[in-house]
Amino acid sequence: MPFVPHSPEDVSVMLDAIGVNTIEDLFADIPAEMRPKSFALPKGLSEMDVCSRLEALSARNRTDVVSFLGAGFYDHHIPKAVDALSSRGEFYTAYTPYQPEAAQGTLQAIFEFQTAVCRLLDMDCANASVYDGGSALFEAMMMAVRATRRRKLVIDEALSPIYRTMLASYTSNLQLELVTVPHRDGLSDMDALKASVDDTCAAVVVQNPNFFGAITDFTDLFTHARAHKALGVISVYPVMQSVLKTPGEMGADIAVADGQSIGQPLSFGGPYLGIMTCTKPLVRQIPGRIVGRTQDVDGRTGYVLTLQAREQHIRRAKATSNICSNQALCALRSLIHLTLLGPEGLVRTAELSMERARYAAERLTALPGVELLHDAPFGNEFAVRLPVSAFEVVDRLTARGYVPGFPVGRYYPGMDNVLLVACTEKHSFEQVGILAEMLGGIL
């Protein structure tokens, strides 16, 4: 039967086939008092009226603001070629390539993505992606639980509070012990983290740069964790990885990231991209798709889904994860973006972003009562302590067309006067100067 609106005759045939008299009989298991009496749907509109309605709604959005928001999601420039190439029909509509002989192009693209992120993070293995940075971090934690057969996880409070909320939600019924180690003025408390990692710990979970923008070397912490047979799990910012010490250099066992900053536009929370990488001993624990490269009997290169004993291929209880899909299109966009930039271009993107952040920090801290939250090095994002409420500053400047940053007090009690400011290569020095002048005018 074609997928078109069914005629009364079609409906009658289908109802007869399944042995019911009316469509309402299909919902007999739902009590009558719980069924909607009416959906109160408005009268249908013509195509022209629908367009007018949507245009009127979209006109309410403010597109003329200059935003210094970050907090894990960044407005980097995306070359137009990313949209042009990723919107090709063979990529845009393709699903999981179960038949490798018919999907070599898709499989090769995923393989190249895996290779690119492994090189970027200096790790051994990667999967084809998961949903976003938060789900990637949860899956990393579960990898550690399976690999170590332990249930205690030590989490740095300087880890993104968005991720920490997701972890608490995802693990609420898993009988895991989540130990959160408080930060110190936006910095990781290394002594407290080490003290919390013992022989019952599955993993220590950190972020670099952390939520407050601080850059940290976790090499000693991961060495300490390894001495207790625990794993080191780190969440990173892909663009900054081009200029920072990599997870591999620090000795991390699992490294994850949200790939939004490479090829994905800011879009009300998604779709984004969860990047997952690990060391070779953990490759059988990593969830999702993995594409491998091999040779056929004639010596020709071929790409296939490999190590498939993970989700729908085996019993649910034996699977590494319930994630049966991935963000292959977003992964492709990230691959195209990385390829267009090249190593030098990615480094330049990071350097330009850091350059503007340094200038912004200098201008803002020159204002009376404004000081950096910490003295640790930072990349393209930093936190400042204001003499007034950060919420008030955000409200007043946003009304004038400049979003000055993120009010940290939204997630951290007692930090209502702390503002998190992020810069990318898209910000001009002039815009930074205007921000400083506007902030100075209300302090």
Swiss-Prot record:
Keywords, alphabetical: Oxidoreductase
GO biological processes: glycine decarboxylation via glycine cleavage system; nucleoside metabolic process
EC number: 1.4.4.2
Sequence intervals crossing the membrane: none
The keyword Oxidoreductase belongs to this UniProt entry's keyword annotation: yes
GO molecular function list: glycine dehydrogenase (decarboxylating) activity
SUPFAM superfamilies in UniProt: PLP-dependent transferases
Signal peptide (residue range): none
Lineage: superkingdom: Bacteria
InterPro entries, alphabetized: GcvPA, GDC-P_N, GDC_P, PyrdxlP-dep_Trfase, PyrdxlP-dep_Trfase_major, PyrdxlP-dep_Trfase_small
Catalysed reactions, as listed in the record: N(6)-[(R)-lipoyl]-L-lysyl-[glycine-cleavage complex H protein] + glycine + H(+) = N(6)-[(R)-S(8)-aminomethyldihydrolipoyl]-L-lysyl-[glycine-cleavage complex H protein] + CO2
UniProt cross-references to Pfam families, sorted A to Z: GDC-P (PF02347)
Keyword Oxidoreductase tagged: yes
Quaternary structure and partners: The glycine cleavage system is composed of four proteins: P, T, L and H. In this organism, the P 'protein' is a heterodimer of two subunits.
Family named by the database record: Belongs to the GcvP family. N-terminal subunit subfamily.
Role played: The glycine cleavage system catalyzes the degradation of glycine. The P protein binds the alpha-amino group of glycine through its pyridoxal phosphate cofactor; CO(2) is released and the remaining methylamine moiety is then transferred to the lipoamide cofactor of the H protein.
Name the UniProt record assigns to this protein: Probable glycine dehydrogenase (decarboxylating) subunit 1
